[in-house]
């Protein structure tokens, strides 16, 4: 666990300053990175010539910042271009200590298969440092384009290959035995699903009884799971967290990762494909993509999780309904037909369990 405890703590009297704001200041970043980051990248002989800071689109209270640094060798007085280089890093900040756990996990994954190997085209961002004084985690920037953006283009011939690669990446993750994974909390899950149920019942009173019963059934099935089948899951394995670059696939955002049912990641990913097809009216054969995804996964790992994929597809469909019409209620008014559609899809999945 390689944390960097800084001597220069946030100045007294800056209580109202968000710690992440320091990393939006080019002068601060240049000095900070030269002292604390470049040595960790074996770049101590370089100085920062220029720093470009880009605050990425972020979830509430979870900002991410891209740092593009142009470096020059300190021993290169002539500033020859061949002595210059650039690097792209991403810093993530939270107001809790979850990123400390995430950093530990990424370091363990890096050392247990994601640093090198025959399948080194299946990647994670390289963990660089965690700064507890600022609750900031720093990692390399993922190269390529989001699979979610490619999905919206609807080119099945291109998507098929990357979705198969996504299955290989997930099998690689699920095959790794980790020590630093956070345990799944059934208590947290119960509270979360209860809130989703209450919100959706408020938005769709005509479907309230059915919605409540579906959430209860999902929770009952989760309570009955045998923890012997649990392993490390990503927890938010969706196309927007997957970057493709030629043959390489890099997956980001491990904050929801924990020790739980591997089928969760499978069902969640497939549900994202299905919801994207409906939302954007994409000309995709999602059933075929699902089959190819699961076939590739089970060719590399146990078929045991397949019998529970429907459970997590069902959960994800209701999560999608909640996110679209409750979390995003300022943009989307309740849609009775859409609600009926996702309830039907949820029931279909649970009937097969």
Positions of predicted regions on the chain:
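Amphipathic, Lys/Arg-enriched alpha-helical patches that create a basic surface
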Residues: 340-353
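Active-site acidic catalytic loop and adjacent metal/ATP-binding pocket
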Residues: 53-81, 85, 135-138, 219-264
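Active-site activation/catalytic loop segments of kinase-like enzymes and analogous catalytic loops
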Residues: 263-301, 314-332
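ATP-binding pocket architecture of kinase catalytic cores
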Residues: 53-62, 68-184
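Short, contiguous acidic/charged loop-to-helix segments that flank catalytic cores in large enzymes
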Residues: 94, 157, 240, 254-260, ...
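A glycine-centered beta->alpha junction motif in the catalytic cores
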Residues: 133-156, 172-179, 195-202, 275, ...
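An alpha-helical support segment within catalytic cores of ATP-dependent transferases
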Residues: 28-47, 52, 114, 178-234, ...
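Juxta-kinase regulatory segment immediately upstream of eukaryotic protein kinase catalytic domains
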Residues: 1-55
């Amino acid at each position: 666990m390689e944390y960097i405890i800084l001597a220069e703590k946030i100045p007294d009297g800056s209580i109202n300053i968000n710690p992440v704001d320091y990393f939006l200041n080019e002068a601060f970043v240049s000095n900070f990175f030269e002292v604390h980051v470049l040595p960790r990248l074996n770049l101590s002989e370089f100085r920062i010539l220029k720093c470009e800071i880009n605050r990425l689109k972020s979830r509430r209270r979870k900002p991410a910042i891209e740092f593009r640094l142009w470096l020059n060798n300190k021993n290169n007085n002539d500033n020859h271009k061949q002595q210059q280089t650039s690097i792209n890093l991403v810093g993530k900040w939270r107001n809790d200590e979850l990123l400390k756990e995430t950093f530990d996990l990424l370091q363990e994954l890096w050392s247990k298969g994601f640093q090198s190997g025959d399948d080194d085209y299946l990647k994670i961002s390289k963990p660089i440092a965690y700064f507890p004084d600022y609750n900031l985690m720093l990692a390399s920037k993922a190269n390529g384009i989001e699979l979610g953006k490619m999905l919206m283009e609807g080119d099945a011939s291109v998507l098929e290959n990357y979705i198969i690669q996504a299955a290989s990446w997930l099998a690689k993750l699920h095959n790794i035995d980790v020590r630093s994974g956070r345990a799944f909390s059934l208590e947290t899950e119960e509270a979360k699903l209860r809130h989703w149920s209450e919100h959706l019942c408020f938005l769709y009173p005509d479907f309230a009884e059915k919605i409540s019963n579906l959430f209860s059934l999902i929770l009952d099935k989760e309570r009955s799971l045998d923890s012997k089948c649990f392993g490390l899951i990503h927890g938010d394995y969706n196309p927007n967290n997957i970057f493709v670059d030629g043959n390489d696939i890099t997956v980001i955002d491990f904050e929801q990762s924990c020790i739980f049912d591997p089928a969760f990641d499978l069902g969640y990913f497939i549900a994202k494909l299905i919801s994207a097809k409906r939302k954007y009216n994409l000309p995709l054969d999602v059933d075929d993509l699902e089959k190819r995804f699961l076939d590739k996964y089970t060719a590399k790992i146990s078929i045991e999780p397949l019998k529970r994929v429907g459970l997590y597809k069902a959960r994800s469909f209701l999560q999608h309904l909640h996110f679209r019409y409750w979390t995003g209620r300022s943009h989307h008014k309740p849609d009775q037909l859409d609600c009926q559609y996702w309830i039907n899809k949820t029931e279909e999945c649970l009937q097969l369990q």
